[in-house]
UniProtKB/Swiss-Prot annotation:
Gene it is expressed from: Or2c1
Annotated Gene3D superfamilies: Rhodopsin 7-helix transmembrane proteins
InterPro entries: GPCR_Rhodpsn, GPCR_Rhodpsn_7TM, Olfact_rcpt
Keyword Ribosomal protein: no
GO annotation terms (biological process): detection of chemical stimulus involved in sensory perception; detection of chemical stimulus involved in sensory perception of smell; G protein-coupled receptor signaling pathway; sensory perception of smell
Gene Ontology CC terms: cell cortex; endoplasmic reticulum membrane; membrane; plasma membrane
TM regions (residue ranges): 25-48, 58-79, 101-120, 140-160, 201-222, 237-261, 273-292
Name of the molecule in the record: Olfactory receptor 2C1
Pfam families in the record: 7tm_4 (PF13853)
Database matches in SUPFAM superfamilies: Family A G protein-coupled receptor-like
Length: 312
């Protein structure tokens, strides 16, 4: 097979979501609708967290970080995906592919860390309620947020550097809808054993380890919730924790399946579906999961809309 000796030139061909061209218009409509819902839902949470004084708490500080992250995460891949679905041009420039690879890895790993931080916030809120605002002070909150974003950036630099050093095959056909590490490894013509080892090691650190920490923390949280005497207090703590756990299992489950399976042996159709799930579906449903049964967010939205009607 021909090896491209000049890996930093030319462009890549993204093979897309489906192998059936007649389904592209359907995928376009569904993904566009999902993207618009993602924008509306996450922007709403960000605005409410900033504008409503009652939501100026550590929990909503981290939730607004998650919403900002989801907005950037989905925007790093969906516009290019929609462009490829809409017309015959399926190419992406080398620079565009590199940018997408770096940004997607950065934001994905950041979310892995941020979900652990949010679990810690829930642990302190439920298990140490009297000391919550003292422990989760603004300095610590900003520090934890910075660690999340910088940790994700470190992951991006490591994985992207190893991936982009591979000799790519001449056809440059990426069998996916975005430039992602597993798909790029499959495109390589040389030995990828080191890349797969790095991928497995880094992804274990950013997925399996955080999930284990979160599950342990929720064991303590469950014990504390059962001791709450107030039915309303127990229900509020339960709803908040369940919402976070649902997001955790959706995101980590799809990430573990998509990244920790051997890059050369995983089913490509399933791989595309999983990539679509954590790049499109998860950012869309996160705002719904966190707000459907959240009286504080509903109240803040009602107050904001009420002010708007009053001003008009």
């Amino acid at each position: 097979m021909e090896v491209d000796s000049n890996s930093s030139s030319g462009s890549f061909i993204l093979m897309g979501v489906s192998d059936h061209p007649h389904l592209e218009i359907i995928f376009f409509a569904v993904i566009l609708a999902s993207y618009l819902l993602t924008l509306v839902g996450n922007l709403t949470i960000i605005l409410l967290s900033r504008l409503d004084a009652r939501l100026h708490t550590p929990m909503y500080f981290f939730l607004s970080n998650l919403s900002s992250l989801d907005l950037a995460f989905t925007t790093s891949s969906v516009p290019q995906m929609l462009k490829n679905l809409w017309g015959p041009d399926k190419t992406i420039s080398y620079g565009g592919c590199v940018t997408q690879l770096y940004v997607f890895l950065w934001l994905g790993a950041t979310e892995c860390i941020l979900l652990v931080v949010m679990a810690f916030d829930r642990y302190v809120a439920v298990c140490r309620p009297l000391h919550y605002m003292t422990v989760m002070n603004p300095r610590l909150c900003w520090g934890l947020a910075a660690i999340s974003w910088l940790g994700g950036l470190g992951n991006s630099v490591i994985q992207s550097t190893f991936t982009l050093q591979l000799p790519f095959c001449g056809h440059r056909k990426v069998d996916n809808f975005l430039c992602e590490v597993p798909a790029m490894i499959k495109l390589a013509c040389g030995d990828t054993s080191l890349n797969e080892a790095v991928l497995n090691g880094v992804c274990t650190f950013f997925t399996v380890v955080p999930v284990s920490v979160i599950l342990v923390s929720y064991c303590f949280i469950a014990q504390a919730v059962m001791k709450i005497r107030s039915v309303e207090g127990r229900r509020k703590a339960f709803n908040t924790c369940v919402s976070h756990l649902v997001v955790v299992f959706l995101f980590y489950g799809s990430a573990i399946y998509g990244y920790l399976l051997p890059a050369k042996s995983s089913n490509q159709s399933q791989g595309k579906f999983i990539s679509l799930f954590y790049s499109v579906v998860t950012p869309m449903v996160n705002p719904l999961i966190y707000t459907l049964r959240n009286k504080e967010v509903k109240g803040a939205l009602g107050r904001l809309l009420g002010k708007g009607r009053g001003a008009s």
